[in-house]
A protein has these predicted regions:
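Charged, flexible cofactor/metal-binding loops and thiol motifs
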Residues: 121, 128, 143, 151, ...
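Short runs of predominantly hydrophobic/aromatic residues within well-ordered alpha helices
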Residues: 37, 84, 88, 234-237, ...
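Generic, well-ordered alpha-helical scaffold segments in large soluble proteins
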Residues: 40, 61, 65-68, 90, ...
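Short, well-ordered beta-strand elements within core beta-sheets of diverse protein domains
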Residues: 40-50, 119, 166, 235-243, ...
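Glycine-rich cofactor/substrate-binding loops
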Residues: 1-36, 97-98, 279-458
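A helix-coil-helix interface module used to build multimeric assemblies
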Residues: 1-201, 206-212, 274-275, 286, ...
């Protein structure tokens, strides 16, 4: 019979039991379930709710179960309803009536809320470490390419010259915001629901401050109804993970473009690419395509959580069992994608020559041509029109701004002199963009200094 079977006269239907069970996915929280139970048993003994002897035996038994699960000596019972019931049943099997005292003044409602917070707190730390590693890998790559000129794009059209370092540092800024969001989520979720009971607390004189402290929380949750029914932290984490995946997907999309024959800006290491079953010439960026695809999956996990919670009255409802598969899936996929993209970035080859050649085409120095006139006193809109007219002239004659004869410039305005060619060279265009956050080597050096400080890099 189930541990909750007192008011029932029949065994639960086998099909219903399988449908109701969550052990298949919540077993991964066994360490956190046992960690929470050890703190709870400690508090029960300290408060005199159970004897110190029983408290010690319960803690001893829980540690034995933890060791046996870690070593593989003990396996999860697939027929158990959930990880909480499995651990309690195993404790009772080993220690008899003493094990039955563990659940005093506790409900599975506050127990599962505790387990999930403990588990996700650890997972956030792991995701944070991976995001940090990815940011570091981007910084290290950027440091090697402060002089590597490439086209900057708007609308996927060549727009203005930048450097590869400048481009990569844009992603570092995204990841820094991701780190901040992870920290904010971890801080907000670091309150302890244990002691909330089923929904209305308990009649026992428990010490919620003690269990919160033992488990590393900042404080107990202030309201018992909220303690068992809150899943904001899951939704907030899924939202943060979705933004991380959006950043990974944008990076992946660019890698997909850059390693195509149409761009050839980079080449993936053979260990991080795949081939075709029929086309022998193919070298496919499957990793980045999968990251792009998995982004949709993580977005779906966020929507699952939002939709699941939107119509639930207070307090706990069985619908909330579905929170775990969604948030576990989101965490697992973000970690998997980060673990894969980091070595891919670290091993890819950058084709500097192709990047510069692409920057030399497409009139990406047209703005600098206009700025040349502005610096000589012409209003920007007039200079803009002249530069656009010169671009049209170049296109009609198959020329570039660098190869257009000086007399053609001077037909437009005598402000053009021989020095225009230096002013519109790619290197000058990049070096001249000295504004804070820009692509000039000086501005990039300052950006590198700032992000390395934030990432605590030497």
């Amino acid at each position: 019979m189930a541990l909750w079977a007192g008011r029932f006269s029949k065994e639960i239907d086998a099909g219903v039991n399988a449908f109701n069970s969550s052990i298949a996915f919540d077993a991964r929280m066994y360490r956190h379930d046992i960690q929470g139970s050890i703190a709870h048993a400690t508090m029960l003994g300290d408060c005199g709710i159970i004897s110190k002897e029983d408290s010690s035996l319960i803690i001893q038994g829980l540690k034995e179960i933890l060791a046996d699960l870690d070593s593989g000596k003990l396996e999860f019972d697939p027929n158990a309803e959930d990880i909480h019931m499995f651990v309690e049943a195993e404790l009772t099997k080993r220690y008899g009536d003493v094990g039955k005292r563990l659940h005093t003044s506790r409900s599975r409602n506050d127990q599962v809320a505790l387990d999930l917070r403990l588990y996700l707190r650890d997972e956030i730390a792991e995701v944070r470490s991976l995001v940090h590693r990815f940011a570091v890998a981007l910084v290290r790559t950027a440091e090697q390419h402060t002089e590597t000129v490439m086209p900057g794009y708007t609308h996927l059209q060549r727009a203005q010259p930048v450097t590869f370092a400048h481009h990569l540092l844009a992603y570092v800024q995204m990841l820094l915001r991701d780190l901040g969001r992870l920290d904010d989520t971890a801080k907000r979720m670091n309150e302890c629901p244990l002691g909330s009971g089923a929904l209305a607390g308990t009649t026992y004189h428990i010490d919620r401050e003690e269990t919160a402290s033992l488990l590393g929380f900042d404080a107990p949750m202030a309201n018992s109804l909220d303690g068992v029914s809150d899943r904001d932290y899951c939704i907030e984490l899924a939202d943060t993970l979705s933004i991380i995946m959006m950043h990974l997907s944008r990076f992946s999309e660019e890698v997909i473009l850059w390693c195509s024959w149409e761009f050839k800006f980079i080449e993936l290491d053979d260990a991080f690419a795949t081939g075709s079953s029929i086309m022998p010439q193919q070298k496919n960026p499957d990793i980045t395509e999968l990251i792009r695809g998995k982004t949709a999956r993580v977005y779906g996990d966020l929507q699952t959580l939002l939709t699941m919670m939107k119509g639930l009255p207070l307090a706990y409802n069985k619908d909330m069992q579905e929170d775990k598969e969604a948030i576990f899936d989101a965490v697992d996929n973000v970690k998997l994608c980060l673990e894969t993209v980091i070595p891919m970035l670290e091993t890819m080859r950058v084709n500097k020559e192709n990047m510069r050649a692409a920057a030399a085409r497409g009139f990406i120095n047209a703005t600098d041509c206009a700025d040349y006139l502005v610096k000589k006193g012409m209003p920007f809109r007039d200079a803009y029109k002249i530069s656009g007219t010169l671009v049209a002239e170049c296109i009609s004659r198959g020329l570039t701004l660098e190869t257009l004869p000086l007399e053609e410039y001077q037909k437009m305005t005598p402000l053009f002199t021989e020095d225009v060619y230096d002013a519109i060279s790619l290197e000058t265009c990049v070096r001249g963009r000295v504004s804070q956050g820009g692509p000039s080597p000086k501005a990039v050096a300052e950006q590198l200094k700032l992000v390395k400080a934030k990432l605590e890099l030497a």
